[in-house]
Amino acid sequence: MRISARYPSFVFPLIMTDRYAKSRELFNRAQNSIAAGVNSGIRKMEQPVPLYFSHGSGSRVWDVDGNEYIDFQIGQGALLYGHAPAGMAEAIGEQAKLGTHWAAQCELEIEVAERLQKLMPGAELVRFNNSATEVVLSAFRLARAHTGRPLILKFEGAYHGWADEGLVGFCPPADKWGDDEAPTRLHPSQGVIPEVLGTFVVARWNDPDHLRRIVDAHHGQIAAIVFEPVMCNTCCMEPTAGLISTIRELCDRDGMLMIADETITGFRFAPGGAQEYLGFTPDLTILGKAIGGGVPFAALVGKKSAMQKIIEGSVVHAGTLNGNPLCLAASKWCLDHVIGLGENHPRIALDLGKQLMSGLRALADKHGIPLRPQGPGPAFHAVMLKPGAAEGPINDYRDYVRRQDAPRWTHLRTCLLEQGVRAIERGLWFISLAHRQQDIDEALIKADAAFAKHAAEWKAA
């Protein structure tokens, strides 16, 4: 097993133990049949080895070596309702008996669309897809057709799916940022034609005045502004005062569409997503992950005026598996679960998330570790600060890169994993509706041991 040269060898002391023997064996076997051994590139980054799992239940998951974890990765946020909820499994099973796919219409798609209309402030009309990446592409096409303009404005460091257009400006290296006033349009992948970059404008997050200047400099050319209401994919940065209202104002003033990417935030902070939580109504909304509870399902929802080109048929939106009945059955169960919880829905994840954040910060202080959790609670990022880095909230991508200590976080995560606490490799944590007080209490006990080990090993190195 090769250890990445990006990190010192002591970062992964667990790699030679037997705790992950079966996962290592399967990963080695997979590389003979699966390109790079994984089916999503980011999974290969997991240390000490990409783990293989056998089953999950509620807030817990078990790997093939029999190790149990309190799961705060929770399917990269898709499993808002926890692992293997019985009602959802039953709904999928009952639908499978009736048919797995028709490439036609069924009543379920109307029922799910009607539930989205009930929940989401901006959902006058709905179209279904299989992934949020597809929805992003559909939203961009629709915005350009609606306005007759070529450019999409997005924020530096933001992730909007893995396709060519979604990755523009995602996590650019510091030596290629460009000027603060004019962030460089970069792409992290080879194989993308240069013309794609020319159809985007990049602005810095959480600077309304800067955003105004960028929009004014491209007046009449921008079709839409796309954004995560809380930038969960990059340090869980909440919008500062005035940012969302400025986006709405500029879109109304210049005839641009406001596109909220609620792939992660949808249903997580409130039944109506971040748009309910923060109090705004976008023109188009991208939904994924929790809308399907772990099955491949996504939706584009929006105002009727913004969806008009699809209604007319002048914008192509198609797909053999769009509105798949198995996925619709799962989504109907998920949305009914959210509706049934009512006002209790946000409190469950919010309260537990805040407790976990506070507990992790207290343990960090106890062990002299510069870990600073930030975010709303149902999703948050545990930021490991570099020596001498400033305290306080991180509010934009450049500040995040300057202040984070990625190798040290990776070491701490391996220590947490050994204790049975699973968070996302880059520092993101999710609270599901299946987590309970016992999970938080137990996770903090385990984290105490992990923090102690990390502090000792990091100091010794």
Locate each region found by the language model.
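N-terminal amphipathic/basic-hydrophobic helices that include classical n-h-c signal peptides
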Residues: 1-15
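Conserved N-terminal phosphate-binding loop of PLP-dependent enzymes in the Aspartate aminotransferase
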Residues: 15-461
